[in-house]
Amino acid sequence: MADTTPEPCGQLMVHSDTHSDTVLASLEDQRKKGFLCDITLIVENVHFRAHKALLAASSEYFSMMFAEEGEIGQSIYMLEGMVADTFGILLEFIYTGYLHASEKTTEQILATAQFLKVYDLVKAYADFQDNHSAPKPPALNCTGTPVVVISNKKNDPLKRKRGRPRKANGLQEGRSELAAEGELQLRVNNSVQNRQNFVFKEEDSVKLSEQTPEDKESEPAGEPGSVEEVPAEKDENFDPKAGDGQESQSRCSRRRIRRSVKLKDYKLLGDEDDQSTAKRLCGRKKRSSGPEARCKDCDRVFKYSHFLAIHQRRHTGERPFKCNECGKGFAQKHSLQVHTRMHTGERPYTCTVCGKALTTKHSLLEHMSLHSGQKSFTCDQCGKYFSQKRQLKSHYRVHTGHSLPECSHCHRKFMDVSQLKKHLRTHTGEKPFTCEICGKSFTAKSSLQTHIRIHRGEKPYSCSICGKCFSDSSAKRRHCILHTGKKPFSCPECGLQFARLDNLKAHLKIHSKEKHTADSSSVSGSNVDEGRNILQLQPYQLSTSGEQEIQLLVTDSVHNINFMPGPSQGVSIVAAESPQSMATDPAANITLLTQQPEQLQGLILSAQQEQAEHIQSLSVIGGQMESSQTEPVHVITLSKETLEHLHAHQEQTTSSVPAADTGARATPVPSTRPGAELTQAPLAVPLDPSPGATVAGWPFGPSSYRSLKM
């Protein structure tokens, strides 16, 4: 009902005595439905959705925490060092003004309320003790557990809640009997009280219509000395449900509860006064928290010595929780549990949109914001929005002048130091993750996990259009782009379009090599002569039958080949470059040198018709010539780029030789081959193809070998 008070100036001031309860009831309904909740509080892996504004208005802890962040806020917070059941009851009090708890948990709830500075509850409990200094035997609920129901209504009869239908008579009678047996009720008005000195205005048991509201100015929230006093409101129609406490307990009992370790403490001006005042309000039954726990290194103050002990590990470097797999230490047990999932590969949280699996629910919630497009983090300098806090932190360097972490080798920049650390492995060659099955090493843990799926034959990611399966989710995403028909990546040199970025990057290398080849043509003849080196291929064994041969596709840039084939393997050489240069160059010859002639079953020369007559000589040391050509099963392509690598070898650097389907790596070694004509050491290329690699039924005919060059 509303009260209308005439004013001398002719204005009316209308006040509703049910508005505050209506707003709180609406917010509580929104919280239960997750509607318009802008913050998630995680306590013992239990997620509580809430409204940030209401938390800040009810708790100085949250108010100060949000004020410290300023405009750079976030939507997910981890509160460690609390019990999920206790925090759930406290959160219900913030939204309803009622506390339903057993006597044995009341002390723990009050300790949490004092820590979070929910002074309305502290005040309500102090009034509760003052009014019941000689309390009656507590009433028992249906389970026989003593229950304390706190509200700020005194000696009011129980009535049904506003707007709700009456329950069955049996339930009403049971609740009346429960109240008659001595259930104590004290309802608290959730208005903002004086947070500094606990100055509360005592209200008599009168109707709100008989009071005159007082308007008082208050300082901004979060500043010392802020005072905003609002008269307490009395709701004559309010009727707490006896089943609310049971419902809350049953809801919390289904949550996964475990011991927490740490909770960040926010130090406010006047905290010492607040603590001493709170002790006086709670009376002698309140257990003293003892002397303050102060860190000697940073002078930070904690309410409990347990939190101080955890905090001091930052200064001492103590990491008591060790990983059994790698020996890495952690300051908190929870951090160790998350780290252990890296070794086990456990990723229990999966994105329902893209199927990506993550190790923690916090990571999943942050990842889901990428799909929803929700950008909860705003830059207070330029107003730009971000979906992740680390993105905002990286962006903030633009305004602060701090540069992003940069690689000293390639000058590439990264969002954080951890990403730079992973990138540096590509330069240093460090591969700390090794496959236990085949011994292959990787620079990233994710690459090892994908590799292990190949051994196991696991392909959990399938294309929804064609059904093709993949062992890596990124490979599936790249594949799905092909079905769209879109080619958003265009070559700036020739305008050729590609559906995938990696294909464009591979294409751009062709242009860069063409430019490099054009520049190298202007090199003096002496340098070219020095570049004509011996390409030494180390022993290479195919995993297939002995009748299959190895085919070398060479160019006019390579004149001598030292190759040691495996047992019962044939070798064929295919000339695949312009005949004009070979005809004009008197040194244009291909020499196959073998150190194990008894293992060479056959040597085959296969060239295009117009090229065969321009090859001046084919020298063979060991082995014998055959005129027939068997079907090629493995092709090793040696193109003009070999000359570039020979120049690099001349400078004592390691470089890669393009080899189709081999992934060959070039390393300089001293020449041990008898009969070497050049003084320079040959370039050794250890060939390591994939197991069972074969190109049987190769689609290119002999006249198309030119297209095989890299």
Curated annotation (Swiss-Prot):
Key word Repeat present: yes
GO biological process, one term: regulation of DNA-templated transcription
Primary residence: nucleus
Localisation: Nucleus
Organism: Mus musculus (Mouse)
Protein name: Zinc finger and BTB domain-containing protein 24
InterPro entries: BTB/POZ_dom, SKP1/BTB/POZ_sf, Znf_C2H2_sf, Znf_C2H2_type
ZnF C2H2-type: positions: 293-315, 321-343, 349-371, 377-399, 405-427, 433-455, 461-483, 489-511
Protein function: May be involved in BMP2-induced transcription.
Tissue: Widely expressed. Highest level in liver, testis and kidney.
Quaternary structure and interacting proteins, as annotated: Interacts with MN1.
Biased composition (Basic and acidic residues): 202-219, 231-244
Pfam family for this entry, one: BTB
Gene Ontology, cellular component aspect: nucleus
Induction: By BMP2 in fibroblast, myoblast and preosteoblast cell lines.
Protein family according to the UniProt entry: Belongs to the krueppel C2H2-type zinc-finger protein family.
Region (Disordered): 134-176, 202-256, 651-676
DNA-binding annotation, residue ranges on this chain: 159-171
Keyword list, A-Z: DNA-binding, Metal-binding, Nucleus, Repeat, Transcription, Transcription regulation, Zinc, Zinc-finger
Segments crossing the lipid bilayer: none
